[in-house]
Curated annotation (Swiss-Prot):
Residues 26-35, 93-102 have a biased composition (Basic and acidic residues). It holds the Pfam family SepF. Residues 1-120 are annotated as: Disordered. It comes from Streptococcus equi subsp. equi (strain 4047). Cell division protein that is part of the divisome complex and is recruited early to the Z-ring. Probably stimulates Z-ring formation, perhaps through the cross-linking of FtsZ protofilaments. Its function overlaps with FtsA. It is found in: Cytoplasm. This is Cell division protein SepF. Keywords: Cell cycle, Cell division, Cytoplasm, Septation. One of its GO terms (biological process) is division septum assembly. Belongs to the SepF family.
Length: 220
C-alpha cells in the first residue's frame, strides 16, 4: 500500500506538471492570440489610414487642374452669354433708330401736306372773262361766290349790254362783300372779300365817272 501511494503521488506529480505545462502553453497561446489579433487589426487600420492619406492628396492635385479647366469654360460661357446681350443691344439701337426715322418721316410728309394745303388755301386764281352777252354775267358772279378773282374785259359787248352787266355784277359784289374796280378803259377787276388790291392812279378816261354808268367803252 505504501508503494502504491508513492507511485500515485509520483504519477500525480508528473500529471500536475503536465497540466501546468499545458495550462502555461494555453495561457501563452491566449496571450499570443490577442497580440496577433491586435496586430492584424492594427495593420488594416494602418492600411486604411495610409489609403486615406493617399486619397486626399489626389484631389488636392486634381483640384487646381479642375479649377484651371473650369476657368476657361466659365470665361467662354460668360463671353457666349455676353454676345446675345450685345446682339440684343445692337438690335434695340437699330430698332429705336428705325422707329425714330419712321416717326420723323411721317412728320415731314405731314408738314409738307400741311404747307401744300395752306398754300393751296392761300393761293388765289384770277379768271379772265370776255363777256359777249348779258347771260355771261351770271358766270362771273358764280366765280366770285367760290372766292375767285375775275378780270372782266367788255371790249366785245355793246354799251347797253355792258352797262347791264356792270349793274348786275356790282350788285352781286356788294351782296357777297366783294369789290369791283376799274383797271383799264374797258377792263374791271372783281375780287372777293379776302383779297385786297392796291391800284396806282392811272390816267383813265372818265375816271371820275361812276362805274355803273361808264359808257365810254372802246369796241373793236
Amino acid at each position: 500500500m505504501a508503494i502504491k501511494d508513492a507511485f500515485n503521488k509520483m504519477i500525480s506529480y508528473f500529471d500536475t506538471d503536465g497540466v501546468s505545462e499545458v495550462e502555461e502553453e494555453l495561457s501563452s497561446k491566449k496571450q499570443e492570440e490577442p497580440v496577433t489579433k491586435s496586430q492584424q487589426t492594427s495593420r488594416p487600420n494602418q492600411q486604411q489610414q495610409a489609403a486615406r492619406a493617399s486619397q486626399p492628396q489626389q484631389p488636392k492635385q486634381a483640384r487646381p487642374q479642375m479649377q484651371a479647366q473650369q476657368r476657361p469654360q466659365s470665361q467662354s460661357r460668360a463671353a457666349y452669354a455676353e454676345r446675345p446681350y450685345q446682339g440684343q443691344s445692337q438690335a434695340r439701337v437699330s430698332h429705336d433708330y428705325n422707329d425714330r426715322r419712321a416717326t420723323s418721316a411721317p412728320s415731314a410728309s405731314s408738314r409738307r401736306e400741311q404747307y401744300q394745303h395752306a398754300a393751296h388755301q392761300e393761293q388765289t386764281t384770277i379768271a379772265l372773262k370776255y363777256p359777249r352777252k348779258y347771260e355771261d354775267a351770271q358766270e362771273i358772279v358764280d366765280l366770285l361766290i367760290v372766292n375767285e378773282c375775275v378780270l372782266i374785259d367788255f371790249q366785245y359787248m355793246l354799251d347797253a349790254q355792258a352797262r347791264r352787266c356792270l349793274d348786275f355784277i356790282d350788285g352781286a359784289s356788294k351782296v357777297l362783300y366783294g369789290t369791283l374796280q376799274r383797271v383799264g378803259s374797258s377792263m374791271y377787276l372783281l375780287t372777293p372779300s379776302n383779297v385786297s388790291v392796291n391800284i396806282e392812279e392811272m390816267n383813265i378816261p372818265n375816271n371820275g365817272q361812276d362805274i355803273g354808268f361808264d359808257f365810254d367803252m372802246k369796241r373793236r
